[in-house]
């Protein structure tokens, strides 16, 4: 059952919104999860991917390959990774596009703005988990 009457559950409208999304919304759509080590270190689960992040491919034909993000191609919702290429019929090599949800970030490129973003997300997440943590004790639960 639909909870919010102002949000459409029409799949066609959802797809239209996704594929006609402006660039700043595509940035958020193109988020990638962090590895377990980074997740515990920074206290966040996922972050929008950017050039110069180091990633490992988690799904598909190139599973297990690691590399640096060369380009975030927002128009096609893909990223290009430095070591993942294929040879064309004319002999030239091209980078293969991979969706950011199919990779995990192993090393973040942190500048001052991105560090602030990570800290802001971690603070909000810790506030929410702090509220939920310890809500029920063994005595209150039968």
Curated annotation (Swiss-Prot):
The keyword Thylakoid does not apply. SMART domains: KOW. Residues 1-24 are annotated as: Disordered. One of its GO terms (cellular component) is cytosolic large ribosomal subunit. GO terms for biological process: cytoplasmic translation; ribosomal large subunit biogenesis. GO terms for molecular function: RNA binding; structural constituent of ribosome. Coiled coil: none annotated. Pfam families: KOW, Ribosomal_L26. It comes from the Eukaryota. The keyword Ribosomal protein applies. Keywords: Ribonucleoprotein, Ribosomal protein. Residues 1-11 have a biased composition (Polar residues). PANTHER family: 60S RIBOSOMAL PROTEIN L26 FAMILY MEMBER. Belongs to the universal ribosomal protein uL24 family. This is Large ribosomal subunit protein uL24.
């Amino acid at each position: 059952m639909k909870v919010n009457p102002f949000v459409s559950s029409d799949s066609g409208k959802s797809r239209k919104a996704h594929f006609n999304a402006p660039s700043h919304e595509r940035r958020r759509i193109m988020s990638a999860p962090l590895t377990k080590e980074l997740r515990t270190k920074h206290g966040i689960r996922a972050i929008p991917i950017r050039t110069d992040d180091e990633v490992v491919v988690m799904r598909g034909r190139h599973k297990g390959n690691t590399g640096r993000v060369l380009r975030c191609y927002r128009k096609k919702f893909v990223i290009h990774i430095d070591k993942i290429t294929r040879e064309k019929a004319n002999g030239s090599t091209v980078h293969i596009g991979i969706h950011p949800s199919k990779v995990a970030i192993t090393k973040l490129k942190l500048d001052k703005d991105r560090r602030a973003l990570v800290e802001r997300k971690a603070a909000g997440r810790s506030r929410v988990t702090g509220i939920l943590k310890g809500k029920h004790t063994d005595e209150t639960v039968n």
